[in-house]
Structure formats: structure tokens, C-alpha cells
């Protein structure tokens, strides 16, 4: 143990010893939050994440306290800003490529599939002429929480902003059904 500490103090230890860690908790009024991190110091990151939860009216919980409210899915987004994708043809192509479900919304087509198949499904759809915007694994909530209290809405927005601004945070997943007229951007 002392050799490792001396080596680290002398600058000889690996400088890029990063590890994945996941923190779970609740935001204001019980909004479920999962925070995926990549850190070189788990204790520092845990303290920072706990601080954000506490500061903005939530609390960090134990592992597994909210992950049962989410399902890991492959999510592929296709560009449909021009509205030129035919829904019937898209359904046929998506199912043929291996997609499970899809929906048209706000200038995009969002497809869900098994997370291990997302890249393959996206590649197949790209070959068929669809413009793939993204294809990644996401934690998709099974239920959503709506906040009606203005203070809760403000605190939830600030919590998400603080988490996303942290350099160690890779992804933030939540089940907040955020209001449409979001002025954060």
C-alpha cells in the first residue's frame, strides 16, 4: 500500500485511472434521476453529486433506488425536419431493420430497439436513405413525473444544469415531464 502511495506522490502512478460510476437519487417532488459519471476520483465526484441533489431540493439515494423506473433501450433519431418521411414506408423500413417501436415528433422520428442493436439498425436505415441524427443507448423512463409548483420546476432545472455542467458527468437521465415552454436554452 505504501509503495503505491509513494509512487503516486512521486508522479509515477497512472494519471488516467478513470472509472465508471452511477449515482441515483430523487430531485424535487420525487423526480427520479440517474447520473452516469467517468471519474478519476470517486469520492470527490460522489460528494459533488450529493451536494447538487441537496442544494436543489433532492436527495441522493442508494444504488438501485430509481433504476427500476428506467429501461435501457437503443434510441435512434432520424431527421424529419422537412416532414418528407412517409409514415407507412418508415414503419416497414424500421421494422425490417430491427426497430421495435417508433414515433414522429417535432421534426424527428424516434425509434427504440434493443441497445445492442442500435448501431446496426441505424446503419441499415442510413443505407435506405434516412438521415440518422443519433444512435445510442439511453435509460428510458417507464413513468414520468410532472412538476406543477414553480419552485420545484426551477430547482429541477437548476439541478439538471448543475449535473450536466460537471466535468465528470457523462449522462443524466430523469423522468421529469418538463414543460414545453422551457426557457433554459
Region spans (language model):
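A generic local secondary-structure boundary/capping motif
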Residues: 21-25, 160
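Structural motif
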Residues: 16-20, 31, 80
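RNA pseudouridine synthases
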Residues: 24-38, 43-76
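Active-site phosphate-binding and catalytic loops of NTP-dependent enzymes
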Residues: 11-20, 58-63
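Conserved small/polar residues in nucleotide/adenosyl-binding loops
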Residues: 1-5
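Positively charged, low-complexity, intrinsically disordered RNA-binding extensions
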Residues: 75-185
Amino acid at each position: 500500500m505504501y509503495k503505491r502511495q509513494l509512487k503516486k506522490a512521486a508522479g509515477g502512478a497512472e494519471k488516467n485511472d478513470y472509472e465508471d460510476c452511477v449515482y441515483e437519487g430523487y430531485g424535487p417532488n420525487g423526480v427520479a434521476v440517474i447520473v452516469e459519471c467517468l471519474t478519476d476520483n470517486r469520492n470527490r465526484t460522489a460528494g459533488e453529486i450529493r451536494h447538487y441533489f441537496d442544494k436543489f431540493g433532492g436527495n441522493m439515494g442508494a444504488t438501485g433506488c430509481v433504476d427500476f423506473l428506467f429501461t435501457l433501450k437503443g434510441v435512434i433519431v432520424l431527421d424529419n425536419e422537412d416532414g418528407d418521411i412517409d409514415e407507412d414506408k418508415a414503419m416497414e423500413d424500421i421494422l425490417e431493420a430491427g426497430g421495435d417501436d417508433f414515433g414522429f415528433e417535432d421534426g424527428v422520428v424516434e425509434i427504440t430497439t434493443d441497445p445492442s442493436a442500435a448501431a446496426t439498425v441505424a446503419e441499415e436505415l442510413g443505407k435506405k436513405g434516412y438521415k440518422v441524427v443519433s444512435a445510442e443507448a439511453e435509460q428510458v423512463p417507464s413513468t414520468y413525473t410532472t412538476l406543477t409548483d414553480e419552485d420545484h420546476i426551477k430547482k429541477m432545472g437548476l439541478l439538471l444544469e448543475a449535473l450536466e455542467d460537471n466535468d465528470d458527468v457523462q449522462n443524466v437521465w430523469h423522468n421529469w415531464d418538463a414543460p414545453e415552454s422551457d426557457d433554459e436554452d
